[in-house]
Curated annotation (Swiss-Prot):
Binding residues for ATP: 11-16
Entry GO MF terms: ATP binding; dephospho-CoA kinase activity
Principal location class: cytoplasm
Subcellular location: Cytoplasm
Recorded superkingdom: Bacteria
Alphabetized UniProt keyword annotations: ATP-binding, Coenzyme A biosynthesis, Cytoplasm, Kinase, Nucleotide-binding, Transferase
Domain DPCK residues, every copy: 3-197
Name listed for the protein in its UniProt record: Dephospho-CoA kinase
PANTHER family, A to Z: BIFUNCTIONAL COENZYME A SYNTHASE-RELATED (PTHR10695:SF46), DEPHOSPHO-COA KINASE-RELATED (PTHR10695)
CDD domains, per the entry: DPCK (cd02022)
Segments passing through the bilayer: none
Length: 197
């Protein structure tokens, strides 16, 4: 089994690439989705997050807007939050890998792959990248996203240039879905049949 780590900065189109891999019947571990499940009503991290960040839990689980507001006021809270979330994500990742070990290629979609130290868990890394003007346009068109919030999120991530330097594959996402799908097929063809490093 080859484990391909998929990452990219905010609004680069990583979710679209992840869906393309899934459409090719490749198992995809979606770290964002896992985190949402862990923070949903009855999610196993609710208690720990509620203790660390009072007032952020409601009937829908973790209220991400309230949590985000607390983190903007006290950025050191990011480390505390990551210390709660990352071990649970690692556990879920190990379960996913065990469940899918018979597949020749699995995709591990983790936005903070480099920043959170998940590179040791994958065999290869694909970085989704786009020109800055496209990235910014996509980001600020999202609900509840402002330019200052976008800049703050970018500041917490490795620069795109640095991610590209560490990548085994760079997926350029500045054109159209047809070009994007062709790159996904090319990477899949390159990796399937090779085995892990």
């Amino acid at each position: 089994m080859i484990i391909l780590g998929l990452t990219g900065s905010i609004a680069m189109g990583k979710s679209t690439v992840s869906r393309l891999f899934a459409q090719m019947k490749r198992p995809v571990f979606d770290a964002d989705k896992v985190v949402h499940q862990l923070q949903a009503p009855n999610g196993r991290l609710l208690s720990a997050i509620g203790q660390a960040f009072p007032g952020v839990i409601d009937e829908k689980g973790v209220n991400r807007q309230k949590l985000g507001a607390q983190l903007l006021q006290k950025p050191e809270g990011f480390r505390r939050l990551e210390a709660i979330i990352h071990p649970a994500v690692v556990e879920e990742l190990h379960l996913f890998l065990r469940k899918n070990r018979s597949h020749p290629l699995v995709i591990v979609d983790i936005p903070l792959l480099f920043e959170a130290g998940f590179t040791r868990s994958v065999d290869y890394i694909a970085v989704v990248s786009a020109p800055y003007w496209i990235q910014k346009r996509r980001a600020v068109s999202r609900p509840n996203m402002t330019e200052s919030r976008f800049r703050g999120l970018l500041a917490r991530q490795w620069p795109d240039r640095k991610k590209r330097q560490q990548a085994d594959f760079i997926i350029e996402n500045g054109r159209n879905i047809i070009a994007l799908a062709a790159q996904v097929r090319q990477i899949t063809g390159c990796l399937v049949g090779q085995g892990s490093r």
